[in-house]
């Protein structure tokens, strides 16, 4: 694993650096394999990043978009990660509908939806059960409790090591999420983290030793490249 940590002066610089990295990796992937695969994160931090991507002139037919996690709500619900990404980016560009690989959330059974999304991924990547295909980029955020995707502290989702997708849980509300072994299979994992409220969690995530189950972002140790992009408010006290 190659680990890089960058602290940017403010959120504007954070988004600009994130955009630059993604565009570089997109260009390389399309040149090498004819397509680019990316898993998106939710939350408020990446919205301006998605808006910036939408402003680019890109080969949209070669870009495939997935979600690292999704709240178990309808796609038009205000809390939907899919809706946020569509509003900020996907509905603004000429990307083929079949290139948007949204999480199914209308089965009234999160386990069924998780299995459907896993099957979809296996079909797309032509991977067998038990194999962990590699996305080009998995984009992640981190909460002030050190959760990432919908992998929350001391939850059952952290115990799942033989699946691509599982059911996460936040305050009794189910979510669909990548498992940490699937995230770790990615060619590049990019954390984009902003805000002073993240400092205590970051200190534990970067500590030489800590309780991984209490700070789930510690589980993210990809086979490929790990990039932490932080704004100054988040990274000011970090010793890296």
Swiss-Prot record:
KW Hydrolase (keyword) present: yes
Keyword check for Membrane: no
GN (gene name): pgl
Annotated catalysed reactions: 6-phospho-D-glucono-1,5-lactone + H2O = 6-phospho-D-gluconate + H(+)
Residue ranges crossing the lipid bilayer per the database entry: none
Organism: Nostoc sp. (strain PCC 7120 / SAG 25.82 / UTEX 2576)
Protein name according to UniProt: 6-phosphogluconolactonase
Any Pfam family hit: Glucosamine_iso
Top-tier EC class: hydrolase
Pathway it works in: Carbohydrate degradation; pentose phosphate pathway; D-ribulose 5-phosphate from D-glucose 6-phosphate (oxidative stage): step 2/3
